């Protein structure tokens, strides 16, 4: 079996052969998020769900991101058929998504979103593992490839934002279907990658997970995801209630992602100069500032624009650095499950917590307190990641 360095040198030269296939998957996957995150709550509001019901329904996807990826990651590592698992999951996700066209009841929508999200959430951790395996030792280049997901997000959020100033929000369902079909198409174009041998292969994966430095990283990232829960659940409703047009809502979402793309492109240089851990610390610090600005400065457009620019740090830099660290920590046969567990315990569990608390806090205490809670959770994450600022994250796998 090839060593890590031999595998990287052999395969990184072929990245361009599959560049657009991987980029296409990222494009449609995040185009779906660009449809879902800003506008699904508005669609639910249009069919007369309450704030608490919207909070619950918007938390279904994070719940599935917590429960499903570890199962799919185990299946991919156990069978050695990572790509096949992605394809099956993409197919079933598209099939179950069709249910949104036939239900407007709370329990019906809950069931459809749960089934769709169970399979939808399976794909990305496995594709992340595939992409990073394919890049080999050149993981800093991940950001440039991942930036095509941001392009898909922008196209979706801006296009739909302008469209919904003229057409009914119910057309959102068709945009989601197009994205699901794109995911399905490109899942069948992805490269199959070999898993390089690593000396941690004989260790149970929980031996790695339970290392103090790894637990601190997971805990901090859990809090960052929880902090973003209110943003993804109520930000669009928040803006509309303060008089912003839907096209302006789309523009503000897009601004953050445009800046995110810039960070992804610059990530190889930033990672080389500062390292992933320092980038994480800066991301958490800026998240505290950003959420306070969103909560208390929504009527000041200039400050709101600055808050959206900070999305480059609170998601773009944060995501690239955290995924890079997870790839260093979980190597060899643990790659798929490592990324899957990271997705489950951070984006899944953290997003679920943030989404679930957002409904009651929004309804009883208002948006100011809701986004102050987000800032507080980011502050707690900053404390955890700062605790490990000596760089032990990246050394934990060795």
What do these predicted regions represent?
Residues 5-16, 187-221:
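Juxtamembrane intracellular "pre-TM" segments in multi-pass secondary transporters
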Residues 9-62, 214-221, 225-252:
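Helix-loop boundary and gating motifs at the non-cytosolic
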Residues 44-45, 75-76, 147, 162-167, ...:
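Interfacial helix-cap and linker-helix signal at transmembrane-aqueous boundaries
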Residues 67-81, 164-165, 263-276, 362-363:
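Helix-to-loop junctions at the C-terminal end of transmembrane segments
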Residues 84-98, 278-293:
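Structural signature of the two symmetry-related core transmembrane helices
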Residues 101-113, 295-307:
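Helix-loop junctions at membrane interfaces in 12-TM secondary transporters
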Residues 114-148:
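Cytoplasmic helix-loop-helix junction between adjacent transmembrane helices
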Residues 171-188, 369-388:
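Symmetry-related core transmembrane helices of the 12-TM Major Facilitator Superfamily/SLC fold
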């Amino acid at each position: 079996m090839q060593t890590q360095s031999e595998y990287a040198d052999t395969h990184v030269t072929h990245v361009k052969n599959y560049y657009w296939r991987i980029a296409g998957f990222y494009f449609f996957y995040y185009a779906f998020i660009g449809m879902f995150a800003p506008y699904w709550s508005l669609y639910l509001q249009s069919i007369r769900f309450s704030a608490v019901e919207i909070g619950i329904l918007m938390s279904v996807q994070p719940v599935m991101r917590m429960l499903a990826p570890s199962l799919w990651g185990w299946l991919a590592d156990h069978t050695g058929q990572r790509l096949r698992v992605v394809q099956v999951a993409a197919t079933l996700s598209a099939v179950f998504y069709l249910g949104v066209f036939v239900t407007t009841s709370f329990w019906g929508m809950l069931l459809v979103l749960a089934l769709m999200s169970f399979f939808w959430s399976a794909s990305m951790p496995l594709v992340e593992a595939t992409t990073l395996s394919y890049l080999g030792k050149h993981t800093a280049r991940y950001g440039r490839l991942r930036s095509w997901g941001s392009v898909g997000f922008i196209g979706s959020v801006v296009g739909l934002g302008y469209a919904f100033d003229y057409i009914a929000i119910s057309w959102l369902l068709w945009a989601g279907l197009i994205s699901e079909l794109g995911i399905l198409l490109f899942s069948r174009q992805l490269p199959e990658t070999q898993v390089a041998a690593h000396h941690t292969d004989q260790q149970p994966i929980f031996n790695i997970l339970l290392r103090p430095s790894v637990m601190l990283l997971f805990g901090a990232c859990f809090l960052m995801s929880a902090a973003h829960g209110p943003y993804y659940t109520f930000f669009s409703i928040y803006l509309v209630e303060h008089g912003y047009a839907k096209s302006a809502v789309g523009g503000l979402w897009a601004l953050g992602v445009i800046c995110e793309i810039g960070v992804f492109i610059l990530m190889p240089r930033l990672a080389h100069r500062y390292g992933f851990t320092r980038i994480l610390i800066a991301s958490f610090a800026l998240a505290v500032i950003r959420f306070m600005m969103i909560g208390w400065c929504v009527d000041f457009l200039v400050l709101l624009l600055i808050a959206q620019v900070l999305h480059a740090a609170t998601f773009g830099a944060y995501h690239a650095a955290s995924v890079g660290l997870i790839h260093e920590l979980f190597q060899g046969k643990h790659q798929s499950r490592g990324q899957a567990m990271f997705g489950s315990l951070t984006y899944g569990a953290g997003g679920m917590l943030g989404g679930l608390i957002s409904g009651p806090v929004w309804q009883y205490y208002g948006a100011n307190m809701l986004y102050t809670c987000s800032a507080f959770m980011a502050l707690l994450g900053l404390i955890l990641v700062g605790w490990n600022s000596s760089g032990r994250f990246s050394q934990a796998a060795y």
